[in-house]
Amino acid sequence: VSCTGSKDCYAPCRKQTGCPNAKCINKSCKCYGC
């Protein structure tokens, strides 16, 4: 998922992992587990 900031990643990562833990790194989302 492309992003401009970490908050762009929270919703897609919550869908993937069930948790909104995420960071935007090099304009793409990195999802972390709970």
Swiss-Prot record:
Site (Aromatic residue of the functional dyad): 32
PTM sites of type Cysteine amide: 34
Role of this protein: Blocks voltage-gated potassium channels Kv1.2/KCNA2 (IC(50)=0.12-0.8 nM), KCa3.1/KCNN4 (IC(50)=1-2.2 nM), Shaker B (IC(50)=2.39-80 nM), Kv1.1/KCNA1 (IC(50)=37-45 or no activity, depending on the study), Kv1.3/KCNA3 (IC(50)=150-180 or no activity, depending on the study).
GO terms for cellular component: extracellular region
Free-text comment on this protein's domains from its UniProt entry: Has the structural arrangement of an alpha-helix connected to a beta-sheet by disulfide bonds (CSalpha/beta).
Protein's organism: Scorpio palmatus (Israeli golden scorpion)
Major localization listed first in the record, in broad terms: secreted
Protein keywords: Amidation, Calcium-activated potassium channel impairing toxin, Disulfide bond, Ion channel impairing toxin, Neurotoxin, Potassium channel impairing toxin, Secreted, Toxin, Voltage-gated potassium channel impairing toxin
Family annotation (InterPro entries): Scorpion_toxin-like_sf, Scorpion_toxinS_K_inh
Subcellular localization: Secreted
Miscellaneous comment text of the record: Negative results: shows very weak or no activity on KCa1.1/KCNMA1, KCa2.1/KCNN1, KCa2.2/KCNN2, KCa2.3/KCNN3, Kir2.3/KCNJ4.
Site (Basic residue of the functional dyad, critical for activity): 23
Family, similarity comment: Belongs to the short scorpion toxin superfamily. Potassium channel inhibitor family. Alpha-KTx 06 subfamily.
Keyword RNA-binding attached: no
Annotated phenotype, changing residue 33 to A: Induces a change in the third and fourth disulfide bonds, leading to disulfide bonds between C-13 and C-31, and C-19 and C-34
Disulfide bonds: 3-24, 9-29, 13-19, 31-34
Metal-binding among keywords: no
Protein name: Potassium channel toxin alpha-KTx 6.2
Gene3D superfamilies assigned to the protein according to its UniProt record, in alphabetical order: Knottin, scorpion toxin-like
GO MF assignments: ion channel inhibitor activity; potassium channel regulator activity; toxin activity
Distribution of this protein across tissues and organs: Expressed by the venom gland.
